[in-house]
């Protein structure tokens, strides 16, 4: 039995790598999980399906630039959260704390180390987030998703890859070539509009759009809109190609399932995270990176034709979640 305290949420990019790792860890040994959530955010909804203990924290991320006046109240909330975390950790007495970034990870990671517990962290993006950079200085082990991330840390890091959350695993049958368009867990109005334009122009293809719950006004018969795709792995394995944003989880999944892809990074991401993540697709010879400001519809259609005609190769490899789970088990159970 391993008792593990976990933090990582607000977005699917932090939440699902943590859940993927926990899923793999419980295949090795029974686990008892204490999960720190952010009040009102995604993880509170998702974790209702899990038999985890949870502690909800009322915290918010810091505004950029960091010296903004509005951060005073946010810092006070984080300090208050540390007191709640301290009591919860003392009561739970974990063997290890595992955090996957985002502002909720900071009070959990710092407090865990102050109380003498092991701390492992995982960074999903090529460019590390502020929380993980800070925590890396005190963590017992740091996992990163990409080789390109190593230069940002002032210590040794372990390149594990980004844990892949696999809900189901089966091939779907489509009656024509299919393009998957996804804008991350929150969706993308830009990609939703782009999907409509492409469906009108490319009647010989079928488009499947994950809208993120956003309404779309498009009546094209070859466009199927889904609010949120639960069994993403099934689609990744079955479509001919994909058009996506450049979130770390999405890029990692594209690489893991070897999906021919066009990545259009969201330009508003912190410190150009998505642009750097997207470059990993070109490094892996999987497809193209297209900036929003440079997007030309006809040129994009040409790229889709190239990628959708490629023969798909599903390469079986170890899930990074398994790699991290084995490292946790090896350390705690030794």
Curated annotation (Swiss-Prot):
One GO cellular component term noted in the UniProt record for this chain: plasma membrane
Natural source organism: Thermosipho melanesiensis (strain DSM 12029 / CIP 104789 / BI429)
Positions annotated to bind UDP-N-acetyl-alpha-D-glucosamine: 11-13, 125, 185, 229, 274
Family: Belongs to the glycosyltransferase 28 family. MurG subfamily.
Gene from which this protein is expressed: murG
A molecular function (GO) term: undecaprenyldiphospho-muramoylpentapeptide beta-N-acetylglucosaminyltransferase activity
PANTHER family: GLYCOSYLTRANSFERASE, UDP-N-ACETYLGLUCOSAMINE--N-ACETYLMURAMYL-(PENTAPEPTIDE) PYROPHOSPHORYL-UNDECAPRENOL N-ACETYLGLUCOSAMINE TRANSFERASE 1
Pathway where this protein functions: Cell wall biogenesis; peptidoglycan biosynthesis
Topology relative to the membrane: Peripheral membrane protein
Name of the protein this chain belongs to: UDP-N-acetylglucosamine--N-acetylmuramyl-(pentapeptide) pyrophosphoryl-undecaprenol N-acetylglucosamine transferase
């Amino acid at each position: 039995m391993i008792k593990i305290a976990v933090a990582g949420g607000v977005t699917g990019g932090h939440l699902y790598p943590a859940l993927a790792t926990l899923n793999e860890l419980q295949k090795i040994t029974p686990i008892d999980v204490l999960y720190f959530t952010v009040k009102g955010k995604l993880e509170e909804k998702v974790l209702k399906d899990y038999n985890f203990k949870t502690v909800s924290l009322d915290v918010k991320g810091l505004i950029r630039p960091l010296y903004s006046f509005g951060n005073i109240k946010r810092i006070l909330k984080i300090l208050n959260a540390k007191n709640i975390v301290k009591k919860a950790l003392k009561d739970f007495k974990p063997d290890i704390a595992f955090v996957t970034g985002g502002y909720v990870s900071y009070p959990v990671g710092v407090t865990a180390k102050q109380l003498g517990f092991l701390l492992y962290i995982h960074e999903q993006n090529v460019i590390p987030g502020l929380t993980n950079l800070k925590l890396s200085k005190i963590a017992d082990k740091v996992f990163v998703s990409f080789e390109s991330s190593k230069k940002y840390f002032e210590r040794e890091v372990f390149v594990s890859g980004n844990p892949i959350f696999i809900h189901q695993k089966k091939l779907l049958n489509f009656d024509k070539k299919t393009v998957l368009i996804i804008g991350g867990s929150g969706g993308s109005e830009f990609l939703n509009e782009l999907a409509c334009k492409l469906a009108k122009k490319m009647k010989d293809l079928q488009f499947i759009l994950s809208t993120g719950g956003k309404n779309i006004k498009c009546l094209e018969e070859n466009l199927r809109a889904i609010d949120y795709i639960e069994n993403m792995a099934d689609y990744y394995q079955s479509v001919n190609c994909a058009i996506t944003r450049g979130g770390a989880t999405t890029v990692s999944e594209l690489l893991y399932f070897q999906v021919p892809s066009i990545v259009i990074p969201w330009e508003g991401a912190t410190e150009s995270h998505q642009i750097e993540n997207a470059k990993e697709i070109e490094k892996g010879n999987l497809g193209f990176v297209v900036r929003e400001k440079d997007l030309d519809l006809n040129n994009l259609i040409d790229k889709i034709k190239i990628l959708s005609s490629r023969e798909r190769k599903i390469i079986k490899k170890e899930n990074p979640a398994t790699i991290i789970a084995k490292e946790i088990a090896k350390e705690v159970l030794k």
